[in-house]
């Protein structure tokens, strides 16, 4: 009799015709005891004519035990997966509201733009966020919220949470960028020029970055023309990576300033130590 191999748990649930059945522990034990009693003839002695059946029964018993063991382990794993799903939402809905409200309040309280003073903004809102996020995570989340709620400006959102986020996003990015789009996407005759969402809202970030000066030897006008025909998806990827790079550079500058201060303190301590030694010896 050929040995049948057990399939993974999820495969067995999907394949209704599979021969392997995951039996409850009690049923497996009962079935095994009955098998043993039957081919022992009820007396505990093995009959010669039953040797073949004993071999088959042993194989069945082994398979049942393996099925029981795999079932118990798989049930444990399923329970763990249920309690700890593989994909967990990092930013809660409350975090998104706090983030958008924080952008508005930060500018009102400090008079600074949270997009220019990123570290100040993070310090401003971090105690209200449900977890400890990195600078890159803050920047990525703000970019994601901006893309999500400015792209669907025309249709808006019907659900409660998303509708609230949409209104907050419009108060941050809507008015300013809508006026830009009206000016830049209209022809002299008043006819609107078709342009993909988001292309105009950040039309100058490429020119203000280090990218354009680095390749201006190819001709500024030529570079701008070629950049205008680059696919929007690629532009957005470059913009996101540039934001992360700028955040890292800002962190490096802070660390450099801290090192300068520390170095200055070390020089001062050396001077004081030298003066003390000189005073003792003179």
Curated annotation (Swiss-Prot):
Pfam families: GeBP-like_C, GeBP-like_DBD. The keyword Transferase does not apply. GO terms for biological process: regulation of DNA-templated transcription. It comes from the Eukaryota. Residues 33-73 are annotated as: Disordered. The keyword Repeat does not apply. InterPro entries: GEBP, GeBP-like_C, GeBP-like_DBD. Keywords: Transcription, Transcription regulation. Coiled coil: none annotated. Belongs to the GeBP family. This is Probable transcription factor At1g66420. It comes from Arabidopsis thaliana (Mouse-ear cress).
């Amino acid at each position: 009799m050929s040995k049948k191999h057990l399939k993974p748990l999820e495969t067995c649930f999907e394949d209704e015709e599979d021969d392997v059945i995951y039996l409850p522990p009690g049923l497996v034990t009962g079935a095994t005891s009955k098998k043993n009693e039957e081919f022992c003839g009820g007396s505990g002695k093995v009959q010669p004519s039953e040797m073949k059946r004993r071999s088959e029964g042993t194989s069945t018993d082994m398979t049942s035990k393996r099925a029981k063991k795999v079932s118990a382990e798989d049930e444990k794993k399923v329970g763990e997966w249920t309690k700890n799903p593989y994909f967990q939402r990092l930013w809660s809905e409350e975090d998104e509201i706090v983030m958008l409200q924080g952008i508005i309040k930060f500018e009102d309280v400090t008079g600074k733009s949270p997009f220019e003073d990123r570290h100040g903004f993070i310090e401003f809102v971090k105690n209200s966020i449900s977890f400890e996020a990195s600078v890159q995570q803050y920047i990525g989340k703000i970019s994601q919220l901006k893309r999500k709620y400015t792209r669907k400006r025309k249709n808006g959102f019907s659900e409660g949470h998303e509708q609230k986020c949409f209104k907050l996003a419009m108060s941050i990015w809507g008015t300013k960028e809508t006026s830009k789009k009206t000016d830049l996407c209209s022809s002299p005759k008043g006819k609107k020029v078709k342009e993909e969402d988001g292309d105009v809202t950040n039309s100058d970030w490429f020119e203000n970055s280090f990218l354009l000066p680095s390749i201006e030897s190819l001709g500024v006008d030529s570079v701008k023309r070629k950049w205008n025909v680059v696919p929007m998806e690629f532009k957005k990827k470059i913009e996101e990576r540039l934001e992360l790079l700028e955040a890292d550079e800002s962190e490096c500058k802070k660390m450099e300033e801290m090192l300068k201060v520390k170095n200055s303190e070390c020089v001062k301590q050396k001077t004081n130590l030298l003066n003390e030694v000189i005073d003792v010896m003179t």
